[in-house]
C-alpha cells in the first residue's frame, strides 16, 4: 500500500511540474551591421549591449533564453529559431520577445497599411536599398510576418499566460552619428517603385490589439512613434537602446509576470524618473487588455 501511494504521489508531482508556468525569452541584438553581407549599407549600433544587459536579469527571474547576436542574427536563423521557439511554447507560458536592431519602412504591396508602408526588423544580412535581381527584400522581417508568429504564440500560450513584445528599433531614423549620438533605423524607405517615404506625424502613443478568449493577452513596447528617431543613450561608457535600458531598470523591482499593466507602470516610472530617456521621443504601447 505504501509503495502504491508513493507511485501515485510521484505521478501527481510529475503532473504538477509538467503543467508549471514556464518563462521563456527570445532575444535578437545586432551591433555590427557594417559588413560585406549588405555592402556596408548600414551604420553600426549597439543592439548586442541590450541583450547582454537584459539576459542575466531574465535568467535570475527563471527565464529560459534563446538569443541571436550579430552574425548569428541572419534572416534564416531568426525565422528558424523563432519557429522552433513558437512550436515549443506551451499553455500558460510567460513569453518575452525582444528585438534590438535597425528598422526600416518597406513599401506596402498588399494594401493592408493605411500609410502605404510596412515596418520591418532588419536582420544582419538585409540590404537597405532595393536592387532588382540582386536584393528584393526577402531578408527583411516584415511586421506582417512577425504578426503571424505572434498570433501563433498567443494561441499556444492561451489565456493563462502572457506575451511581451519589445521593439527597440526605429523605422524613421536618420541612420547617422551626430554629436556623439547613435540613431537606430533609417528614413530611407525600402521601395520597389521609387516611392519616397514621408513619415506622418502621429500623436497617439497607445493602440488596442484584438483580444480573444482563446488567446493570451499581449503587450507591445516600442521605443518611439513612427515619425520619431530612436536615439541610443550612454550609461557608464556603454550605449544602449533607451527602451531596453529602462526595461532593465524596471525588472530590478518588478519581475515579469502575467500582470503586464503593473510592469508597464514600472517601465514608465523608470522613464519618467531615471534620467535616461531621450527628449522628443515617446514610448508606444499596444495592448490587448
Regions found by a protein language model. Give the residues of each.
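Residue-level detector of intrinsically disordered/flexible regions characterized by low predicted structural confidence
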Residues: 4-5, 165
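Cysteine endopeptidase catalytic domains of the caspase/legumain-like
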Residues: 20-289
